[in-house]
């Protein structure tokens, strides 16, 4: 019995360091621009992160949000970032990331609008509006206009009524 307690302790410590090591490796790959490799590391280590503590899970969710943003999966990124509001682990990084996220969403919506993908543009502009409803009311107007251009009048009316 005396041998099992230290063995269990060392396994737990090794497990914790393994989680942090994989997360740091994925963060470094993301920072160097290798988004696919960072995503692959997170997917392959998903079972390892299931039992992680709250700090590691918050950092993992933040990185997953950044990866989703760079893959232009804005809905997923938004839900990841929203789940982190009020979390002390990433509270210093989140406002800056949300500003960059808002700019990326709006730029993507503008590109969609120029390409004639008005429905996609409308949904992205509505997402940008939802980031800060007080200061981004103009995005709701543009989302409604894009919905009109996409001939989705019910959605446009919904957006106009929300104004």
Predicted regions located by residue number:
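N-terminal leader/linker segments that initiate helical-solenoid repeat arrays
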Residues: 2, 6, 16-103, 107, ...
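Alpha-helical positions within canonical tetratricopeptide repeat
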Residues: 37, 76, 120-121, 155
């Amino acid at each position: 019995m005396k041998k099992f307690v230290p063995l269990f302790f060392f396994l737990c410590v090794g497990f914790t360091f393994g989680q942090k090591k994989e997360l740091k490796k994925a963060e470094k790959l993301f920072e160097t621009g290798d988004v696919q490799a960072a995503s692959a590391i997170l997917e392959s280590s998903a079972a390892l992160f299931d039992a992680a503590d709250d700090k590691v899970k918050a950092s993992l969710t933040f990185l997953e949000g950044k990866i989703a943003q760079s893959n232009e999966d804005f809905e997923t990124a938004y839900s990841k970032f929203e789940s982190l509001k009020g979390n002390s682990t990433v509270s210093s990084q989140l406002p800056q990331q949300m500003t960059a996220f808002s700019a990326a969403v709006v730029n993507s919506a503008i590109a969609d609008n120029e390409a004639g993908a008005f429905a996609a543009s409308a949904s992205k502009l509505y997402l940008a509006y939802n980031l800060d409803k007080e200061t981004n009311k103009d995005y709701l107007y543009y989302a409604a206009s894009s919905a009109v251009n996409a001939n989705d009048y019910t959605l446009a009316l919904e957006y106009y009524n929300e104004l």
